[in-house]
Every structure is written in C-alpha cells, then in structure tokens.
Amino acid sequence: MLANEVAAAAGEPLPHIMTKTFMDTFVFMGGAGTGISLAGALILFGKTQASRKIGIFSLVPGLFNINEVLLFGLPIVLNPLMLIPFLLTPVLLAAISYVAVAAGLVPGTNVATEWTTPILLNGYLSTGSLSGSALQLANLVVGVLIYAPFVLIANKIKVKQINDAFRSLLRRSCATADSSRRCLDHNDDAGSLARSLITDLEYDY
C-alpha cells in the first residue's frame, strides 16, 4: 500500500491493484465473508423473526466491518451451509473489483484507510473517487444475491426443525399425565421449544 501512496503522490501509475486497503474496502465489507451482504440477505429473505433480528442487529456494526454478531449469533461458525457463501462471496467480489480497477472503471487504492472506516466512506477515501463507493454498492448487491439462496435454504431447514419439534412435543404431552415435566427436561429441540413456551407464558401472565 505504501508503494501506491508514493506513486500517487508523484503522479505516477499505481504499481499494485491488490492491497490490504483494496481487500478491506471492496471485499471484506462488513468483516470476513462480506458480512454486510449476509446481513442484507437476512433482512430481505429471512423468514423467521430470529434471523431477521440478527440481520438488523448486525447491520450497524457491519457498517464498521465488525461481524461477530453474525459469526456467533447466526451462527456462521461450525455451520456448513453458510460456510459455502462465506468463502465464495469474497473470492467473487475480489475478482469483480480487480477487473473494475484493471479496466480503469475505478481508481486503485492510493490512500490507506483503517479497516473500521465505514463502508462507502472508505470507498471514496481510499480511491479519491465516488466510483469507489459505487463499486462497493455493486459488490454489496452481488453479495446479497450470493447469500440469498443459502438463507432461503436455512429458512426451510429451520421451519422443518420447528414443525418437527412441535409434533414431538405434542406426542409427548399427550402420552401420559406426568409428561409435561419430562418434556421440559429433554435436551432436544422439543425440550427447548417447551421451555420457550413456558417462558413466554410466564412473561405474558
């Protein structure tokens, strides 16, 4: 990045396209895995209240490239389904951004910015052009489109888990007179659902 800054100050062509600032600005928007795109996909395509809330709660820190809410709240960690777009999105956005800079559509990064600089602002500051921010917006949309089908698949899996838990809970509650206590003691999805229902009832009344 220093070589680019020196070249820009001297009015010479930038020697490097791929720099740390390039990756922070155009690829890792919202943190690793382009988390801001995942947050957008959750807000737009999430079918459960929990997934939409995670998307909303992660949006503000995501603007500053902080994505721990998504990593451990969704979660992405140890989630094979979300690991695919988590790895694929940065690779594709890096390629798109490289081509855009190489073709002269967007200036190269010639000013180092901190990784926590807000999205869109860092696109302008690092390139000295609004086209840098425009490329970020384009990458954001592409990232949302990549994450969208995986979010939809996750929705179906979650809904099926909830439905299965309801059926299991219903069978157990109708089995014997003292089954309600045993339902609460189970450590599976049905037990978790039973405890959630009890908590909601206690909260409401």
Task: Describe the function of each predicted region.
Residues 190, 197-199, 205:
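Intrinsic disorder/low-complexity segments
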Residues 186, 190-192:
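Generic signature of intrinsically disordered, low-complexity, basic-rich segments
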Residues 3-20, 71-185:
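Transmembrane alpha-helical segments and their short flanking loops
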Residues 2-86, 90:
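Helix-loop-helix junctions within the multi-pass membrane cores of secondary transporters/permeases
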Residues 179-180, 192, 196:
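Serine residues within intrinsically disordered or low-complexity segments
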